Amino acid sequence: MKHSRFYQTVVAIAMMLMGWLPSLAHDFEVDGICYNILSDNSVEVTYNGSSYNNDYEDVIIPETVTHDGSTYSVTSIGERAFYDSKLTSIKIPNSVTGIGNSAFAFCTSLTSLEIPNSVTSIGSYAFIECSSLASIEIPNGVTDIDERVFSFCTSLTSLEIPNSVTSIGSSAFYHCQGLTSIEIPDSVTSIGDYAFSGCSGLTSAVIGNGVTNIGERAFVYCSSLTSVEIRNGVTSIGVRMFEGCTSLTSVEIPNSVTCIDVEAFNMCTSLTSIEIPNSVTSIENHAFFNCTSLTNIEIPDSVTSIGSFAFDGCTSLSSVVIGNGVTSIGHYVFF
């Protein structure tokens, strides 16, 4: 609990510095829910100044609300609207198109959530540490899963990413320990740094054909990950991408990959075999460091450089074939 509160404080300070914390004032209140007027006919749900901790556990947001004789359409859930509230369930109407930054951050009791297909944007940190949320259906109109949207949603076991999504932001699913499998559709072109880092329950991952860029440490310490399918499109196995994936036994690297980057498979202690395609030209420092179960390796002629300590600590390695194209070998490659 102390760790959680400390983390909340750090996040709050970060949001203040980035200008994410809204004014505590609101234009009006109806049935215990506060609103800010956006235009002559639309409003957003907003923070009430002390969070909704003592007001509601089950919330149904109306499509329209009337104030001073004017009727407004509820079109968005504003930044930090339900931050650190004791909500257990919330129903969002079809009139809403956007969910703001940190809108439901630290709602640790939230178990049920309905997001309508009308929603096209979900802001950064929107559901961070909603630790009781078990499943979520992302609407088909959402194009970006922003940074840290679902970080520390430790009970999240079910997730479907729709074909509308083109990017997954940094740490989007960081430490979602209950997540067991993930399939990234072909529509996604980029996966941010640490996107699935620390998802210790994740056993399988499929990365779609559209992905060309995967950030650093995207799957670091996914300790239960046994299989990963990387389809053609990815050009680099990035820095520490699978570091500490201690259950990973084999990986098929696609022909689109040209570089196996620094510490890409560091401490993948169950990795017994890997096939390096002819597209790869460089294997960087510590790429397979401490892969203690790796028994053989064949480096194709396409590879021109092997970094220092690339296979250091591979204590079971009994067969090594180095291709004719290698012109540069670093220090202690097989130490």
Regions found by a protein language model. Give the residues of each.
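Structural signature of tandem-repeat unit edges
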Residues: D40-N41, N54-S76, S85-G98, T108-S121, ...
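Consensus positions within tandem repeat domains that build extended binding/scaffold surfaces
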Residues: G78-A81, G100-F106, G123-I128, D146-F152, ...
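Generic recognition of long tandem-repeat/solenoid scaffolds
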Residues: L38-S50
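Bacterial N-terminal signal peptides
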Residues: V10-W20
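Positively charged n-region of N-terminal signal peptides that target proteins for export
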Residues: M1-Q8
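Boundary at the C-terminal end of the N-terminal hydrophobic targeting segment
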Residues: S23-D27, G32-C34
